[in-house]
Regions:
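Alpha-helical interface subdomain recognition
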Residues: 3-177
Length: 177
């Protein structure tokens, strides 16, 4: 009895609290990896030419780069909001579940796009992209698979609407309370 941390039956809640901060750290790692993948892609497309034109000057390539930049930006804002709430000691469960799914899928998409922009070089071992691509797949499984987090998030959206008549509290609530 003297070795019990917290109160009896509080172990799961304590574990969830620890996971909240771990997920924040994982999220920051995902953003950094996505940013590096986009940097590698940018370095490649500005020097690579096809049919007499730089890849960087092609509209489709620019759209791909823009989409990656937008995803990284959304991820950063999401993490800043979660970090703010963590600093204030606020409940992070809903935001962490949303972010866990979004960030794992975001880094997967950005690294995949970087590989695509590199062509066969991106899938070789001459860049870190192929190794990252296989490693980041686990992000959608660890700390609970995407489907579990989506199920919980969806349930919270319904619950918020039934309780408050709006889904806002299940979508991050007030950005800075």
């Amino acid at each position: 009895r003297e070795n019990i941390l917290g109160g009896r039956g509080q172990g799961f809640n304590m574990g969830q609290h620890r996971l909240a901060y771990g997920r924040l750290r994982h999220g920051m790692h995902n953003v950094a990896m996505a940013q590096r993948a986009l940097d590698l892609a940018a370095a490649h497309v500005v020097q690579r030419e096809t049919f007499g034109k730089r890849l960087a000057d092609r509209q489709g390539v620019r759209w791909m780069m823009a989409d990656c930049a937008a995803e990284i930006y959304k991820a950063r804002l999401m993490l800043l909001h979660i970090a703010y709430k963590a600093e204030k000691g606020m409940d992070l469960r809903q935001e962490n579940g949303i972010a866990k799914v979004f960030l794992a899928n975001m880094v997967h998409q950005v690294v995949d796009t970087a590989i695509q922009l590199h062509g066969a070089l991106g899938y070789s071992h001459d860049t870190p992209l192929a190794r990252w691509y296989t490693g980041i797949r686990s992000q959608r499984l660890v700390d609970g698979p995407d489907e579990v987090h989506r199920w919980r998030t969806g349930a919270n959206v319904i619950k918020a609407f039934e309780k408050y008549g709006t889904t806002a509290s299940a979508c991050g609530g007030e950005l800075f309370e």
